Curated annotation (Swiss-Prot):
Domain of life: Bacteria
Keyword Heme: no
Name of the protein in question: Allantoinase
Gene Ontology molecular functions: allantoinase activity; cobalt ion binding; zinc ion binding
Amino acid sequence: MSFDLIIKNGTVILENEARVIDIAVQGGKIAAIGENLEEAKNVLDATGLIVSPGMVDAHTHISEPGRTHWEGYETGTRAAAKGGITTMIEMPLNQLPATVDRETIELKFDAAKGKLTIDAAQLGGLVSYNLDRLHELDEVGVVGFKCFVATCGDRGIDNDFRDVNDWQFYKGAQKLGEMDQTVLVHCENALICDELGEEAKREGRVTAHDYVASRPVFTEVEAIRRVLYLAKAAGCRLHVCHISSPEGVEEVTRARQEGQDVTCESCPHYFVLDTDQFEEIGTLAKCSPPIRDQENQKGMWEKLFNGEIDCLVSDHSPCPPEMKAGNIMQAWGGIAGLQNCMDVMFDEAVQKRGMSLPMFGKLMATNAADIFGLKHKGRIAPGKDADLVFIQPDSSYVLKNEDLEYRHKVSPYVGRTIGARITKTILRGDVIYDIEHGFPVPPKGQFILKHQQ
């Protein structure tokens, strides 16, 4: 049999091992994995490279439509491809209108036409004003529902995203449980964080350390405990977003050990940046929950290696530069990190700390695909989509602004020496990014709907 493509001589990350083996691709799918595969229209030599499943980034903000001047599908998904991401799961905010019903999700689909360099799945929003319309999003095919128990949204904009109170969360989770959906939650105590932040501003405490102190670990832990209990009472699967503290992870682990259906994610910035670096970098490293101190970071690495964190995500949430102006307490909170999840974490986790390649593959791709029901994604195995990434290990470069594909070429990682490089990204059998030739094919990404899985 002649295949469309054979990838030869790479160290391939399989689910439970990594070894030098060939991959054959036919019709956009992985057709065979074995030694000495022959006869293909095209052959790629991956000698000396790691061949990983394409990253499934389960937490991405592309602010189109309505705030395309923050980030758009064209720039955002090009950055994703350059960073080794082949599937993103997009959040129902920061776009306007927020994605909270059938009409608003159709606006998203229309806005993305012809612009997706990678594949995308969509989350719906659970907000204070759409409890009677959640079913519309489920029927369209979202793979989960995001909500905030921290304060969220611009109160001056009618169709912006909104946080939920405990009653709204409980009722929404009940409905989502009946739909066999997952609720994803941003967990920080709204009132305490808001009041601590206002208090700091009044007293002129506006440094990075002051911002971190205004969103202490206990505000994350309390919110995680609360939503765990309410989701359990409501009968709904729970996914805790961007955990920043080992104490927060421990709450999820405890609930899981007691039999609750709960998963969690974290982000590269909580593992590679600390509060002192945040102070040096400035507002580009502001996010919530905040980047914490070195002792906290050490605990997060332990939780990651223990297998207590299910997946790593970018939480890519950029904005125009003017929204990062001023002091840290005033600036927009969000990090542009989409393009540098895989290379940074390969360097820090695999090369510097000895993480196994199969564990890396699970954290970057497999587990997220499983959590959100993306049955064709996340694994290098026969029958799966041929979504693959070539990583060149032990290949250092210094990230520059001009390397970035974002609408606004800024990132807290600019100036960082990264010890690995993404050299090629393949989506359903086609090379969509190559380090030497850029983006060789027109955008071919498509939306993945739950009911099509």
